[in-house]
Amino acid sequence: MIAGMFIRNFKTYQGINYIPIADLQNLSGFLGNNGIGKSSILEAIDTIFNDNSWNYNIVVKKGGLDKTAPYIVPFFILEYDFFNDEILPYAKAIDHIARNIKEDDATNATTKEVISNFILHRKRLFDRYDLSNKLLLPIGQDYNKSISLSIFGGKSLNMISEANFDGISLSREKIISNDYSDFSPLLSYILDYLEYLYIPKEIDSELFTKLESSGTQVLMGESLHAILDRIIGETTVTDINKELNTFLEEISDKLVNYSYRTPTDRQKKIQKREVYNLIIQAFFSVRKLHRKQSEEQYLEINNLSSGEKQKAIIDVAHALLTKHHQNGEKLIIAIDEPESSLHMSACFEQFNALS
């Protein structure tokens, strides 16, 4: 899970901040006034996972990127067996730092407060869960897409530099120059195996719930191309090409001195991807989500109220995750204001579905 996040000069958050995100394993929520930074947290994680553009804090415009050095560092808690043998030593190295960092490791008053906040949250997690078989992993990226360890770099990382730590050797020269590229495979591994789906408040419910949308395919746990591959497959596409070529040969024989060909010597065949794209365009794109009103009456999602649209998104997400997705434990869903525009009586049902 993502237990917390270190964030610097991103959107609402100025300077270095530690944000506790999760005390529970399945569901976490944020409460607070508008503008306090709830959406910023969800958007920041989306930036790391899905390579979206950075939404910098206003101080970045005044001071410049080099001086303000924005970064986003999620604090992951993952099982040992999540990692392969090649990546595991790097994960254990960061885990060692995260478990042992203390306030005395701070280089100034600001980082001391951040470390203190992290230690308080770490203690709360230790009190609630047995984390002996899990790894504590604060790792993310800065504005240059370079590896960032936030407060765990520099002096903290020196604890294991120039030493063979469980099979890996870290260079003191790299650490001094804030180069943590040795841990790049670790972050890539995590981001490749986990999925993060962010549903912002202002999302277009019609576009999001279409079967060909990236969000719906993430919820299904497979792409439409993978589904069509099961239905159609390589053999069918090969047969189509064979029959089409036979037809062209018959036409050419009848035309004698003329032939239908491509400009090059190599005659193009229909690719599987092209067939699938045509099917998606002709079959799936014309279909929209409808809510069943009665046995014979359906209401298009665009005609629902704002609250009903929000509920429809949650209903679709819940149904696909619980009834279709084969590996939902590796998917993290972040929903901005899931109760938006809902009547108070419907809020409990909405949150119950999310949990």
Please place each PLM-identified region on the residue numbering.
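Switch/communication elements of ASCE P-loop NTPase nucleotide-binding domains
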Residues: 1-56, 289-355
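Extended helical coiled-coil dimerization/tether regions that scaffold
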Residues: 197, 201-335, 344
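P-loop NTPase switch/coupling surface
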Residues: 1-221
